């Protein structure tokens, strides 16, 4: 997926149940930027965005960055760690994914999550995906 339009069309087709939640803002070699506008069901007590929603946008952003480098859709998550720094306010969330290593078998990277109103990031995810074995 070499453009925001290609990526949007792919997600609309393959992940049609959730694709409309995400707006792809940028995609290039090893990076992506994704926006999510939270809805009522994304909130938890205390009027903040829930952790699972932050996992969701991070996963989407990192998968998009991988698809730019390798359009094979069969890459899967094998490891994930997430640090929550600050409760995000109820505003748009942004996830900036960066691939740190793109190997033959594994892709390692990080995703920084920030909200529209926060000066600094609200969370960081470190993740590893396994790439499909080419025969």
What are these model-predicted stretches?
Residues 1-135:
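Terminal targeting signals and extreme-terminal segments of soluble enzymes
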């Amino acid at each position: 997926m070499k453009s925001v339009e290609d990526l949007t069309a792919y997600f609309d087709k393959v992940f049609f149940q959730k694709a409309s939640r995400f707006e792809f803002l940028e995609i290039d070699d090893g990076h992506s930027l994704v926006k999510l506008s939270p809805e009522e069901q994304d909130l938890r007590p205390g009027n903040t965005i829930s952790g699972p929603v932050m996992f969701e946008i991070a996963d989407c952003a990192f998968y998009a960055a991988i698809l730019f480098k390798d359009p094979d859709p069969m890459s899967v998550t094998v490891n994930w760690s997430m640090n929550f720094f600050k409760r995000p306010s109820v505003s748009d969330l942004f996830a900036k994914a960066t691939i740190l290593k793109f190997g033959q078998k594994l892709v390692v990277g990080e995703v920084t999550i920030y909200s529209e109103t926060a000066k600094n990031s609200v969370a960081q995810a470190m993740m590893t995906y396994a790439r499909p074995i080419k025969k």
